[in-house]
Curated annotation (Swiss-Prot):
Family the entry assigns: Belongs to the staphylococcal hemolytic protein family.
GO CC entries: extracellular region
Organism: Staphylococcus cohnii subsp. cohnii
Cited Pfam families: PSMbeta
Protein location: Secreted
Name by which UniProt lists this protein: Hemolysin H1C
N-formylmethionine carried by residues: M1
Keywords assigned by UniProt, alphabetized: Cytolysis, Formylation, Hemolysis, Secreted, Toxin, Virulence
General function of this protein: Virulence factor. Causes hemolysis of erythrocytes from sheep (HD(50)=7.53 mM), rabbit (HD(50)=28.07 mM), guinea pig (HD(50)=4.23 mM), dog (HD(50)=4.37 mM) and human (HD(50)=3.32 mM). Acts synergistically with beta-hemolysins from S.aureus ATCC 25923. Cytotoxic towards human dermal fibroblasts.
Length: 43
């Protein structure tokens, strides 16, 4: 769960710094970590 929070934090910081490439990759990281977290309930 802490990985998701860290990824969201990175996305927000990148957005505030107008670093759009890092923001995009951070959002993708949030989605991937969220999918892994949800998949953990089904295994």
């Amino acid at each position: 769960m802490s990985g998701i929070v860290e990824a969201i934090s990175n996305a927000v910081k990148s957005g505030l710094d107008h670093d759009w490439v890092n923001m995009g990759t951070s959002i993708a990281d949030v989605v991937a970590k969220g999918a892994d977290f949800i998949a953990g309930f089904f295994s």
